[in-house]
Amino acid sequence: MLPMRPELLKGHLDALLLAVLEPGPQHGYAVIESLRSGSDGALHLPTGTVYPALHRLERAGLIASDWQTVGGRRRRAYHLTQAGHITLSEHRALWDQFSTAVTALLKRRTWPATA
């Protein structure tokens, strides 16, 4: 698999984080691991990318958090709000349209071989 270029993530991080939180609450490190494992390792994002995005989504009211104690350690667990569920549905609809259009265009082209 080719390494994921960071610029490809622009505009999609919010949707990815909302999708990872859809099944239920997760603490920050679990979110990072869910992104990595759910993408077969393609999305291995640093904490400096994920935590600020989680805080931004929380300020926007798309996710909320609660403190939990796990293994004797306090961790903040994030979960989707109703607005987050709605926004995720909207992101999915837009992604379906976008990816269909891009796939249609890219499959028509013959790309030059790269060395």
List the predicted regions and their residue ranges.
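Basic amphipathic alpha-helical segments that dock to polyanions
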Residues: 50-57
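N-terminal helix-turn-helix DNA-binding core of bacterial DNA-binding proteins
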Residues: 5-49
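Short beta-strand/turn micro-motifs at beta-sheet edges
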Residues: 3-7, 65-67
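A positively charged, amphipathic N-terminal helix/segment that binds anionic biomolecules
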Residues: 1-3, 78
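Basic, amphipathic "hinge/linker" alpha-helix immediately C-terminal to the N-terminal HTH DNA-binding motif
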Residues: 73-92
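Amphipathic alpha-helical dimerization/coiled-coil segments
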Residues: 86-115
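Beta-hairpin "wing" of winged helix-turn-helix
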Residues: 58-74, 79
